[in-house]
Amino acid sequence: SLHDALPILGGYIVLEPRSATHYLLSDQKTRLVDEKRRAARHAAGLLEAHQMAFFDCGTTTPWIIDAIDNELPFTGVCYSLNTFLALQEKPLCRAILCGGEFHASNAIFLPLSLQDTLSHLSPDIAYYSAAGIDCEQGATCYNLEELPVKHWAMNNARYHVLVVDHSKFGKVRPARMGELSRFDVIASDVRPDDDLLALAKEKQISLLY
């Protein structure tokens, strides 16, 4: 319907394409909310006062921000509209939104050049979302346009936290972020399967669940 095709993001109406294999933020935001919140709470506890944190796009990320103590001062770096709106709610957060071309399906701003704002930043910690995690294929997502900023964070942040609910286990999506060994922590809502437990032990990845 026309109503479904015109979601409201941050007070603005945007037209978005729809296909069975394409990630749409508006479709995902009501799925597995309790599970996402549980994983997010584990991850939020890793942030320390006065740190700079990178926050990925996706529907789990705002729950990480929601779980951060309102008394904690920090700097939040983001490139998606829904993440920026969540950061605005934290009274002691200095929010940095990286601008660029807007993509409505996942509400991200893709920088026209990574040499703009991002080249001046070196986050203490980075929080990532993914649509799939697999022991062989690593962390993957739906949209190729997310990869430049995700890869920037993976190369420039000092500590890396992958935050996923259990529905992402064993899934492989088209856009590859990287090996699971690139992450220091994987936070989820339930205990991962034995294969992932074994990989985490081998690669010294901390698991939070």
Tell me the role of every PLM-derived stretch.
Residues 1-54, 66-71, 88-92:
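HTH-adjacent hinge/linker in prokaryotic transcriptional regulators
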Residues 56-57, 165:
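Short His-Asn-centered micro-motif
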Residues 59-62:
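Gly/Ser/Thr-rich loops at beta-strand to alpha-helix junctions
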Residues 69-74, 144:
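A glycine- and small-aliphatic-rich helix-loop capping segment at beta-alpha/alpha-beta transitions
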Residues 74-77, 95:
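Short beta-strand element of Class I
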Residues 82-209:
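Conserved phosphate- and dinucleotide-binding cores of soluble alpha/beta proteins
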